[in-house]
Amino acid sequence: MNMSSSSRKLSRLFNIVTQNQKSPVLLSSDQEAARRITACLVEKSTIGKLQSNPSLLFNLNSNVTRLVLSEPTLPTQSCIDFFKLLREFESNLKPDLTAVVTLSHRLYSNRRFNEMRSLLNSVVNDGFYKRPVEELGSAMVDCDISEEKFEFFEKFFDLVFRVYVDNGMFEEGLRVFDYMVKKGLSIDERSCIVFLVAAKKRRRIDLCLEIFRRMVDSGVKITVYSLTIVVEGLCRRGEVEKSKKLIKEFSVKGIKPEAYTYNTIINAYVKQRDFSGVEGVLKVMKKDGVVYNKVTYTLLMELSVKNGKMSDAEKLFDEMRERGIESDVHVYTSLISWNCRKGNMKRAFLLFDELTEKGLSPSSYTYGALIDGVCKVGEMGAAEILMNEMQSKGVNITQVVFNTLIDGYCRKGMVDEASMIYDVMEQKGFQADVFTCNTIASCFNRLKRYDEAKQWLFRMMEGGVKLSTVSYTNLIDVYCKEGNVEEAKRLFVEMSSKGVQPNAITYNVMIYAYCKQGKIKEARKLRANMEANGMDPDSYTYTSLIHGECIADNVDEAMRLFSEMGLKGLDQNSVTYTVMISGLSKAGKSDEAFGLYDEMKRKGYTIDNKVYTALIGSMHSPET
């Protein structure tokens, strides 16, 4: 039987005795009670001995518990077991603050610091740490531990401080810090760094600054590491100039920043695409003799790529190697990814080969970048080879990689292959996300396989995936193409009621459907609604409306819209011209139609048979 189940059994037994024993056996003194309990605990079966004599526990109180835990003849492990046993009870037998301090002191004396920290962590939910920190100091006195034992005091409060931080109790941690300063206890900078790191992870930059200020004011040793954490926190918050001032302030005090300190500021500037800001930092680094490290080079390469200077990124990569700084998988993956985005697949594969020749193992991100690159250029065979290689080498295929493959197949119109990849993804335990379903449904839609497109979107809803704007637009488009504009309209209204807002594409789909059916009034209303919601009609919107007005024989209104497009700087493409020429020709306005035909030729548009047929027809149509 394990310790926990034995403790629970004893707890139940004690409760039974409590209810049924009218006159428990009370011993003459706390010392006698402690001696009797200690005698039980030195036996091999600690819990078993107490189970045979549970009435002993009636004599327990705070002082007896303290005497037992501080008894030098009792093995420390027995003390730990006894403490754990008492924590199982739901009565006043539970260990109090003096018990925690006593056992902590014992563990400290035995140099069992990890167990001491575990003990303090284990009682975090027992309510002790919600009390004022001064009560911890009072408990020391109650346990006959004098403040002269500075070493224990410092270790104890240092661990309590860390426990607060581990459990996200930052305000309480600050109070412990202040108490230690007040009592003249030295504070370990490493513990303060633990606080800084934890607060930064939770994006509590205010707390980082607060503890750092206390560290400076109380004379805690400040190192470049703690300074860098605060600098990074400020940069995350967008306060780059403040972080630079902090670096300057501590440089004067002899805390010289390292490359990784400056990297945090460079990273902030890179995200802002602030090239001059980066140049300023590099000048300071050069002046102070701070040498670039791997991260510095990687950030500078990233900035070069963002500024469209891939050749500069390659030069930095070469410079890094010339200086003997070894590139890791992250550096290679970044370069491979950037080259893939630029369509430089040959260079990307050369870098991949170089990576493997150096004995580095490509990560899922490395393969993902290459797969994304080959998918974008339509080389799905290469994508399959890379995926198979990932599997053979035991590299995890992430959902991002699966989605990339699905997107690649759908771009090529290979929707059945995309569906098979989806099945493999499901077998691997991945849940379909909105991107996956939208990609496949859109492909079915483009291929005019409308029933399958709808099935995918319905399947998405049944699987609990919330429809996005793209999902609704897809479904609305399918119904419009099937001629079911009423159902499309119902979905259009439904999406807004469910908090999914239509975008310009959604409006364009509905406007086109109404125009095609000759419902020009409804199309006009949608345009007005679109503009009221802050969306400007684009070339597609205008072309649809022009087509609708022409169908409704409102060719003058269509021409007005055509002119309005030009005034707004919208692209009057070949489709727009063809629609307008057809409308004018049908209305017998051959001069205007031929005028637009001449414009088309001047702009270099390809003129198809529809235009010629319309122009010929215009010469035989009476002008309206």
Swiss-Prot record:
Alphabetical keyword list: Repeat
PPR repeat copies, ranges: 153-187, 188-222, 223-257, 258-292, 293-327, 328-362, 363-397, 398-432, 433-467, 468-502, 503-537, 538-572, 573-607
InterPro entries, sorted: Pentatricopeptide_rpt, PROP1-like_PPR_dom, TPR-like_helical_dom_sf
This protein's record includes keyword Repeat: yes
SUPFAM superfamilies: HCP-like
Similarity comment: Belongs to the PPR family. P subfamily.
Protein name as annotated: Pentatricopeptide repeat-containing protein At2g32630
Species the sequence originates in: Arabidopsis thaliana
